[in-house]
Amino acid sequence: MTPLLELKDIRRSYPAGDEQVEVLKGITLDIYAGEMVAIVGASGSGKSTLMNILGCLDKATSGTYRVAGQDVATLDADALAQLRREHFGFIFQRYHLLSHLTAEQNVEVPAVYAGLERKQRLLRAQELLQRLGLEDRTEYYPAQLSGGQQQRVSIARALMNGGQVILADEPTGALDSHSGEEVMAILHQLRDRGHMVIIVTHDPQVAAQAERVIEIRDGEIVRNPPAIEKVNVAGGTEPVVNTVSGWRQFVSGFNEALTMAWRALAANKMRTLLTMLGIIIGIASVVSIVVVGDAAKQMVLADIRSIGTNTIDVYPGKDFGDDDPQYQQALKYDDLIAIQKQPWVASATPAVSQNLRLRYNNVDVAASANGVSGDYFNVYGMTFSEGNTFNQEQLNGRAQVVVLDSNTRRQLFPHKADVVGEVILVGNMPARVIGVAEEKQSMFGSSKVLRVWLPYSTMSGRVMGQSWLNSITVRVKEGFDSAEAEQQLTRLLSLRHGKKDFFTWNMDGVLKTVEKTTRTLQLFLTLVAVISLVVGGIGVMNIMLVSVTERTREIGIRMAVGARASDVLQQFLIEAVLVCLVGGALGITLSLLIAFTLQLFLPGWEIGFSPLALLLAFLCSTATGILFGWLPARNAARLDPVDALVRE
């Protein structure tokens, strides 16, 4: 009969400084299916090292080890993990159950890595626990179970994927005599069902219950009686689980990794919350700055637009402050008519102005009187709370009519409900009120100067007695480039005047400058917020590194029951991403609260959350989890299963 496990001249040595210490010295051993074998020896004899090699947790330095005819030395790490999943079941002295999982969930772990569907996995775990007398303890956590019950859960876990070979390391070492007898009885039952049972022990009473006792001393086998031939041993073995494959296996594996990651995080709620805190603050900072910064920018731009955007002002002279008399009369009414005929002009309004006294009954105030056309109010986006603007007949006839701003109305008519039709003195000229321009609220504050507007023909001919204009304001048609319009306007007037005796002021340039400035400031603040997010990410990495250290034994257990390095990497990476995503969701919630609070104190601001801001937050959370979770996850995946199992 061909042996199931075949070892030939197995040697295992470990470095000790500059030397190599040989722990196993030429072990040759055959073990057959259905055998119950005990490996005995004193501490340091090499029996645990031999068991690790038998269970494919460790590799021999030299020699040949075959499992069902397959040479283990030719297998890579993933193939060894598959071999452990499909052929071996481990029973440890200290049970090695995962404390944050129930008995049922602990039993399911090997099948999770085998890719068994959840429903089948659950039924299989319940069946095994029922067979071992734990049907009423399926939802109990390890801390709620006795030592004997924990060891039975460990046995059920070993059988989950079939457990053709049961490797029991001191299975009764931590149990009282009664519980120890129960465990040994179960191992005998497994032997009777066709399992190969290998017990590593130093207890002679336990070893005596095996059919074959192999003694190892100083790394060499000193006693190895012949095997007892078995008949029909395969007839009663456990069924090997049937797994899904392809895309379904990937989806199932990812879902299970997500579930296990959530359970691990839920087991340490306070630490998880503190880990999230940096991410919460970072995401809240990024989202709040993006959203509030955008609201502030829109508020500033709205105020600038209220002054008049897409407009070009033309003034006489070389620049602001130029009072050279030869330039004061540069702008004429003919210039206004020529400008209005240009195809890119939506409207053009002249302006002449002078500071005058306004009088009504016994009220006397100073104000700025401005001669404009009816288009002036459209150019500057102003609306009327009472009355209306000038019509063409009033402009042509130099009508004695006036439009007040809201501040002037309050000064002259504090108690009147309707002021249209009232007559006031503008300087020494009586003028009938035909409208009140609505005051525009601005974050820059309102002007303290009282202002009134008259037809420019009236202002020039009746009030000031001048034939030239102080300025012309041109509104450019939508869709036409403002800079190009400014160039054409300059070219037109220069040709008409024969020289450049004027200058222009383009509000669109101011708007673009403000947009650039606010964008730069917002970028700077966002970078500051991103720094806080990076600090939070470093916190996640630190905690995950600590978590890997604390959970080293758990990683060893998972590898022993069949987890591949990629499975471990995936789980810890998902944990890091999950922390960051939940932290990101809480950060977005916090930013909503911040925005809501700001909205209460700043009612004029329109604070809204764009899909872009939320997408940015989601991507930041995910990227932070992947970036700062990679190193801890990689460290976990690189752990040696033997070292991980023995580490405290």
Curated annotation (Swiss-Prot):
The chain crosses the membrane at residues 273-293, 523-543, 576-596, 600-620. ATP binds at residues 41-48. It comes from the Bacteria. It is a multi-pass membrane protein. It is found in: Cell inner membrane. Keywords: Antibiotic resistance, ATP-binding, Cell inner membrane, Cell membrane, Membrane, Nucleotide-binding, Translocase, Transmembrane, Transmembrane helix, Transport. GO terms for cellular component: plasma membrane. Its EC number is 7.6.2.-. Disulfide bonds: none annotated. GO terms for molecular function: ATP binding; ATP hydrolysis activity; transmembrane transporter activity. Residues 5-243 form the ABC transporter domain. One of its GO terms (biological process) is response to antibiotic. InterPro entries: AAA+_ATPase, ABC3_permease_C, ABC_transporter-like_ATP-bd, ABC_transporter-like_CS, MacB-like_ATP-bd, MacB_PCD, Macrolide_Exporter_MacB, P-loop_NTPase. Its main location: membrane. Belongs to the ABC transporter superfamily. Macrolide exporter (TC 3.A.1.122) family. Part of the tripartite efflux system MacAB-TolC. MacB is a non-canonical ABC transporter that contains transmembrane domains (TMD), which form a pore in the inner membrane, and an ATP-binding domain (NBD), which is responsible for energy generation. Confers resistance against macrolides. Homodimer. Part of the tripartite efflux system MacAB-TolC, which is composed of an inner membrane transporter, MacB, a periplasmic membrane fusion protein, MacA, and an outer membrane component, TolC. The complex forms a large protein conduit and can translocate molecules across both the inner and outer membranes. Interacts with MacA. This is Macrolide export ATP-binding/permease protein MacB. It comes from Shigella boydii serotype 4 (strain Sb227).
